[in-house]
Amino acid sequence: MINFVPVNEPLLNGNELTYVQKCIETGWISSDGSFVRRFEEEFAMRVDRKHGIAVCNGSVALDAAVAALDIGTEDEVILPTFTIISCVSAIVRAGATPVVLDCDPYTWNMDVSQIEDKITPRTKAIMVVHIYGLPVDMDPVISLSEKYGLKIIEDAAEAHGLTYKGKACGSFGDISMFSFYPNKLITTGEGGMIVTDDDHLADRCRSLRNLCFQPKRRFVHEDLGWNFRMSNIQAALGVAQLERLDESIAKKKYIGRRYNELLSDIPRIQLPLDRTDYAENVYWVYGIVLDNKMQFDAEEAMRRLARRDIGSRPFFWPMHEQPVFKKMGLFNGESCPVAERLARQGFYIPSGLALTDEQMDKVAEAMQEVMS
């Protein structure tokens, strides 16, 4: 009998234990250990970047990226409203102004057709966020960045193994970042990675993550930084996980496509796109959007699934509707109807790497009951 099916369960069945044990046996558990450098080099190579800078989580990677680009009080950054709060938080903490876009109703990524209308003389960067397993349409973003002299910050936190027109996500930004939270295709428990081809940005991020210690006069500081370091133990997990990334991508695609078959006959729900003209879905999560004609919303659907021992998670809540930003006077009068609908009608079901066929069958059966 299958018990509760969690929305995610990480898979740690490679060299994780061996590498972590090596850290403990040698005493190298801090950020100075060899696994940190190895993880940085191998991950950067995987996404075709010159530099990898390991940090303690994906959110701080955004803070460091914004700081490294010297984004400040006179600047605006364009980004999707349908994203995690870390994106806007990094901009606000830098004293800059976030400017949000609505999203595409089918890919759930930022609507790139809206970008140019949002550009002003104060715009310094576009922050793209690849959502839930499909990438942003990058060609228009790159074209606009070149036309207006803007930087691209690429949030690839959910995009491990994802490609756009055959090129790795994470390779498009002036500076890009990844997350290694337990629900990602690569996990270090907590962790993140900044990648870039720019030597100056890489040096700046390395300094910022390490309290801006100086090479020769360690405790004399020319600037303020943070302790954003990744430990050797975390990096050891990352190296082991990276070794199995192709296997993990294949498993995610299998889960997504099997769900597509199992759920295809349920009326009044929108399933994820398997592919677009420029990408193939890696199904980081398996999202479902209820039709407006459904008599209940995502919150009620998740309650009904929970009663059947099925875990689920709501979609992002739009940034322009966040109470904390309303108190700051941000996004007054902003309307993003697609994101607002996705937030109320969207949720995702169990799709972790440890998911079994038997568990998927149970989820599908519960979905049939809930949606009937």
Segments from the language model and where they lie:
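N-terminal "arm"/small-domain region of PLP-dependent enzymes with the aminotransferase-like
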Residues: 1-29, 350
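Structural detector of well-ordered beta-strand residues that form the stable sheet scaffold
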Residues: 53, 78, 99, 152-153, ...
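PLP-dependent aminotransferase-like
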Residues: 67-156, 163
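Conserved active-site segment immediately N-terminal to the catalytic lysine
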Residues: 154-188, 217-222
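Active-site PLP attachment segment
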Residues: 171-210, 232-235
